[in-house]
Amino acid sequence: SLVGSEMCIRDRLKGITLTLATTALVACGPGQKQSNFSSSSMHTTETENLLANLKKVSSKGIMFGHHDDTNYGIGWDGEEGRSDVKSVCGDYPAVISFDLGHIELGDTVSLDNVPFSKIRQEILSQYKRGGMSSLSWHLRNPLTGGDSWDVSDTTVVKSVLPGGSNHEKFTGWVSKVSAFINSLQTEDGVKVPVLFRPWHEHTGSWFWWGEKLCTPEEYKALWQMTVDILREDGVNNALYAYSPGSEPQDTVQYLNRYPGDELVDVIGFDTYQFDRDSYIANLEKSLAIIDSIGKTHNKVIAITETGYEGISDSKWWTETLLPVIEKYPIVYVLVWRNARERVTHFYAPYPGQVSANDFVEFYKDPKTLFAADVNSLYK
């Protein structure tokens, strides 16, 4: 078929792009019987390999990501192997993100009504197909009992730090995240690496850990404490991502609440399109900032969340997003979820959506990487 021949051509193009990325990788990934440990770090070998390969991948192309991609989409929920992205272009995203909100409560389903058992299964599936999984955490407010967006009290972060009234409760909450990440194991006992992205968009003030709700020192202490608890709980299969919004205007502002190089592997930012011109300006500004910091701090850089709700622009992928991002060595760009319960709340196309054909062109571009393009991340 024409589609098949187009895909063959596209695969050959991408194969050329990726040859260098895949030939030099040492095999010690999903096929082995158990995780090895790198003597120089607190990471499993697979996790060390992931970090090393992320640094290589960014010189070959940009991985495409989508939140909750295989959990649900427009007009479907929980169907095995289904993906709106795959339905449009024939491949899964190279990166899929998931959210752990409500795991702290001991619930069996997330704040978006996805069973944590399903999230675990999808992370394992993404690992087996060679892609990467990222985790965010829209947790409840430990002081008020409200959600992440409850900013009615400005002392929440202070209350969870050592000596605070909610410190013990919070420590237990983080340990539930530890237990989940530690449970991500293949049948052969290999711990699956994930990118954990806590305390995101903190340069705004819409979450209880936001800029106006804690001091820079309190925010950094929150980060340090979170990573310390995870490490003490034996989590050795996590990399960490720091992702403010697009509010920082320069590197100094970006680093104002940066918790430190020893706690962060990936730096990025979240920004969404409302007005096209200001979106492009925000992208350019924020990409220049993380590109500069990434080089000086030796960090992987990414667009950790972005998108255009409803994608009403039929050429958005190739005429707005791609021309800006292809100029920078970012490792991935991730768009938000296709909500099955809010039919206008979607950020990736589905079959018949107005930008679907353009997304196929975006997919065929040698600079964009999908799951089949990055199957050696852990080797």
Say what each PLM segment does.
Residues L2-I9, C28:
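Short, small-residue-biased leader/transition segments that mark boundaries at the very start
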Residues I9-G15:
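N-terminal export leaders
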Residues K33-V95, G101, V109-N113, D373-K379:
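N-terminal module-boundary/linker segments of secreted carbohydrate-active enzymes
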Residues T47-L50, W76-V85, S117-Q121, V177-F180, ...:
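Alpha-helical scaffolding within the catalytic cores
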Residues I62-D69, K299-K379:
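Substrate-binding cleft of secreted/luminal carbohydrate-active enzymes
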Residues G65-H67, R197-W199, W223-V252, K299-I311, ...:
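Aromatic-lined carbohydrate-recognition surfaces of secreted/lumenal glycan-active proteins
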Residues I96-F98, Y254-I280, W336-N338:
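Aromatic- and acid-rich polysaccharide-binding/catalytic face
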Residues G101, L105-N236:
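Substrate-binding cleft of extracellular glycoside hydrolase catalytic domains
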